[in-house]
Amino acid sequence: MNAVTDLKHDYLVADIKLADWGRKEIAIAETEMPGLMAIRDEFAASQPLKGARIAGSLHMTIQTAVLIETLKALGADVRWASCNIFSTQDHAAAAIAASGTPVFAFKGESLKEYWDFTHRIFEWADGGTPNMILDDGGDATLLLHLGAKAEQDASVIAKPGSEEETFLFAAIKEKLAKDATFYSRNLDAIKGVTEETTTGVHRLYQMAQRGELRFPAINVNDSVTKSKFDNLYGCRESLVDGIKRATDVMIAGKVAVVAGYGDVGKGSAQALRALSAQVWVTEIDPICALQAAMEGYRVVTMDYAAEHGDIFVTCTGNYHVITHDHMAKMKDQAIVCNIGHFDNEIDIASVEQYQWEEIKPQVDHVIFPDGKKIIILAKGRLVNLGCATGHPSYVMSSSFANQTIAQIELWTEAQKGSSKYPVGVYTLPKHLDEKVARLQLKKLNAQLTVLTDKQAAYIGVSKEGPYKADHYRY
């Protein structure tokens, strides 16, 4: 990729000439994002994000472009990078850059470029800092916290444990050599972070438990209108899109092994079964395993499934779910992919010792010593964004409506000097979840039943909602 940065402008994209194409697709996406556009219309006049300087680290797609322009319409100043080296849609990045928003992203970044670009979202053109983070996977949040630690103790970045850490640690060392207080200065300015995905939320809770988190965080992922829609229905459509575009494989009749049966796994399993695959599920959690079994899926271990499966999909958010030994046992031409966040769900590092043969971008043969080949998609990173274009606009409207509301909530409370959000991890209240659902329903011409006064009194809720207790499981 010969991406070009224009020194007269504050951006780095693959080709700024793609902006017109991107703008046309953004216009179409807006018609499919009713919740997000309704929030833009509702708050545009009051400018609740005025003064917010948002460092955004989230897949730079057409749908994200609509999110960025919503944040700006509500008064925010924004800088953006993608949270994945393969997920950028170059025409989307070009359209946003052409509109005047600093964006640093192109499809097929190196790890060095990735961490350079993540730094760029904290480097405001006026020499100032951001005061909010919008994160997906937690890398932007991690960068500031780890960098601030390294300012005090360089040993924390002395021994990388992975290829990813090698480039991350090198980037931090390079920045500290130029600016010894860069991370702590940025960290002190941040009023809060809103986190998009399961993996990033896990990181936030771990940091909070260790007493390391330095600012309040809203867990957007666990809003019902995010996790039960984006994670399930989004993956149900985008997983197979990625596999099909990458391989043109016939899915009917194949044994498809889905590792993990949370919301992402449920959507993935449904998609594969809808195309008549024989779906097997691996799980550690007996409740999720029982759900899978009751849906008619065969529940097995990966040790057993490895030599039988034709297609493997990891959906766990965990580490080394598919190991070298598993891949060594797989059939010739088995397809291996991931729809969790990071590439370490599959132990990609363990097969880098073998010959790799690129079939096309993000589709590789890994050739084992005995001549067997397996197909790895997107080098173990997100298959739906690496090999396709991610979730459809409609379902991303729910997720990004939650992101926007969460940014407004944290920023406005910080501006008031409120003590509502001390350092910790929070979720949005139920009435806001229901608001997002109401906004989305209009697009589908759905008609909600209205409780009578007697019905509301009988079940002990307000006629206007919320209709469920916080402990209710949808």
From Swiss-Prot:
Protein name: Adenosylhomocysteinase
Gene symbol of the encoding locus: ahcY
SMART domains: AdoHcyase, AdoHcyase_NAD
Cofactor binding notes: Binds 1 NAD(+) per subunit.
InterPro entries cross-referenced by the UniProt entry: Adenosylhomocyst_ase-like_sf, Adenosylhomocysteinase-like, Ado_hCys_hydrolase_NAD-bd, NAD(P)-bd_dom_sf, S-Ado-L-homoCys_hydrolase_CS
Principal subcellular localisation of the protein: cytoplasm
Subcellular location: Cytoplasm
GO CC annotation: cytosol
Family of the protein in this entry: Belongs to the adenosylhomocysteinase family.
EC number annotated for this UniProt entry: 3.13.2.1
Known function: May play a key role in the regulation of the intracellular concentration of adenosylhomocysteine.
Annotated pathway: Amino-acid biosynthesis; L-homocysteine biosynthesis; L-homocysteine from S-adenosyl-L-homocysteine: step 1/1
Cofactor requirements of the protein: NAD(+)
Binding, NAD(+): 197-199, 231, 260-265, 283, 318, 339-341, 384
Catalysis: reaction(s): S-adenosyl-L-homocysteine + H2O = L-homocysteine + adenosine
Keywords: Cytoplasm, Hydrolase, NAD, One-carbon metabolism
Keyword Hydrolase annotated: yes
